[in-house]
Amino acid sequence: MNLTIGPTPATVPALLGVPIEFILFAAMLVGVALFHRHTLRVALIGLAAVVGYKFFVTGFKAGPSFDGLVAHMHQEWVMLMNLFLLLVGFALLSRHFEKSRIPAVLPRILPHDWKGAFCLLVIVFVLSSFLDNIAAALVGGAMAHTLFRAKVHIGYLAAIVAASNAGGSGSVLGDTTTTMMWVDGVQPLDVFRAYTGASVAILVCGVPAAIQQQRYSPILKHEHKYVQVDLPRVGVVVFILAAAIATNVMINLRSPGLSHSFPFIGASVACAVLMSVVVRRPDWEIVPAAMKGSIFLLSLVLCATFMPVERLPGASWQTALGLGFVSAVFDNIPLTALALKQGGYDWGVLAYAVGFGGSMIWFGSSAGVALSNTYPESKSVILWLKHGWHVTVAYVVGFGALLFIAGWYPNAPHKGEIGVSWSVSTGR
């Protein structure tokens, strides 16, 4: 995809025609890739640099100086708080799931070779179709932790993230971006077409990842003796998930406009976690690490919202393919919002692209960041790309399969005509 930025007004500082904000954002991403042991510090420094530049030089989209910053945060706080509460809440949920000892009985039903590891990815894929992809990835990570004796290959971790994002790409309940499409008026069946590409993609990346994992640490062949499932803890897991699903459905069906006014889903998960304390104590010890990872992701997301991107190239399958690669480093929520504003996309193709595309780098999706909090060794772009090479291949193959089998059927623009080039906002 040929992404171009329109002519920069003289009042907007730029380097070789590229706004300074993009340069600062790119420098932050490079820093995260190079200094993977200090990702939070790099992200916070990058955020401070972008905010400082907007504050003192260009102003914000909502206005200059402090008033503009406050107005911008007022627009974004619901999304940020939802992400924060979901990341921390689902981290506690995944620990509940692991301690329920359900993963310890999985050897009863899973094959005892690489096919067992692949079946686990399919389970994550299915879970993500009706759960949030963050929860599906963390549950998958908890199962892998037990089944592979806490030795999980980075390539397999990348596949877990890919499975969770693929499973959510065709469901209006499985991912934030598809829920945004649903709220905006896109029909669920139009989004469902994404599963054509997602199914091919999970096969392409799942088999190599499963073989990687089996060679690295074979799956348990026998369940632990005298395993007794903690049923009350299972009930806690079901209760928290039910709260999230019910809130998501009720808000988006009955009062979709309210979803932008308060972080209902995140708050419902937090309340469910607190209410379940009377049944089983959550593993509060993991909260600091979960919060650290959440703040890192929120820093990236917030930086992305400050970028002066107002328009996308014309809606086409080439644009959708490119947006998938962009979503690996640029938050897919604002990309999806811009695409909805523009209209004219095949929403199934776009849902697959921005959903699965974020799996190519560990911080490209909220599911990847959440899982990396459990497996810190995965916080390396180089190792993720090296061992998770099959995810990038799967994205391209899955996209091609989606176009070949389902075709490109764009919907008529429903938000008015939008130009076909990137434009630069002065923020004033």
Stretch-by-stretch model annotation:
Residues K115-S169, M180-D184, A337-Y352, E377-S380:
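Hydrophobic transmembrane alpha-helices that form the pore/transport pathway of multi-pass ion
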Residues L16-E21, M79-L83, I109-V122, F148-A158, ...:
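Membrane-interfacial loop-to-helix junctions in multi-pass transporters
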Residues P9-G17, L34-T39, S65-L83, P111, ...:
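Interfacial loop-to-helix junctions that mark the boundaries of transmembrane helices
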Residues I240-Y345, T426-G427:
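Transmembrane helical segments that form the transport core of multi-pass membrane transport proteins
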Residues H36-T39, L93-R101, L127-V139, G167-D175, ...:
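Short helix-coil transition sites and intra-membrane helix breaks within transmembrane domains
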Residues L40-A49, L106-C119, V152-A162, E285-L298, ...:
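Cytoplasmic-side transmembrane-helix entry/capping segments in multi-pass membrane proteins
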Residues V18-L29, H36-G63, L80-L92, R233-A243, ...:
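Hydrophobic mid-bilayer segments of alpha-helices in multi-pass membrane transport proteins
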Residues L93, K99-I102, A150-I154, A158, ...:
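Juxtamembrane and boundary regions of transmembrane helices in multi-pass small-molecule transporters
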